[in-house]
């Protein structure tokens, strides 16, 4: 009974989550005040970074004890120099789960005109910033590509011990990759999936 009692104690305060998550990230989808409109602000990752040259939102890895909101605002300030006081977060879009064990929490926020004017990108992280009108995404469908995730087991998997044949029909997976072209920029992948989800709400 001691083992069961210990298990009960552990579950008294347990909050269910998604099994297999190893890393959590948060990004801010920033809508900025520009001449009476509210286009979406994007950044291009600096040279030398992983995935350099890709279009993305400000954001990054959630630190221990940090909420998605705290992470998104911190990263936005670090990457773009926008003070947290100039960002009003008004919602959170559906989180994205990656096949390699990560969760991405996208938050939607409005950046004031003062915050937009204060932008000073970190040269170590951001090559450039640009905006895209919301109506572009509302009126333009992305190109959509799909790639397959095929299971590949090691040759020493114990098929006989678990009672299955070697041609067992393991489940694979599919990943949707939307791609938008805007002027000289390509918005694709995870960032495009976030945008697509927001536009479909």
Question: Residue locations for each model-derived region?
Answer:
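N-terminal leader/linker segments that precede catalytic domains of diphosphate-processing enzymes
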Residues: 1-56, 61-118, 135, 147, ...
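Flexible glycine-rich active-site/ligand-binding loops centered on an Asp-His dyad
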Residues: 126-131
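An acidic-aromatic pocket/loop used at catalytic or ligand-binding sites
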Residues: 132-138
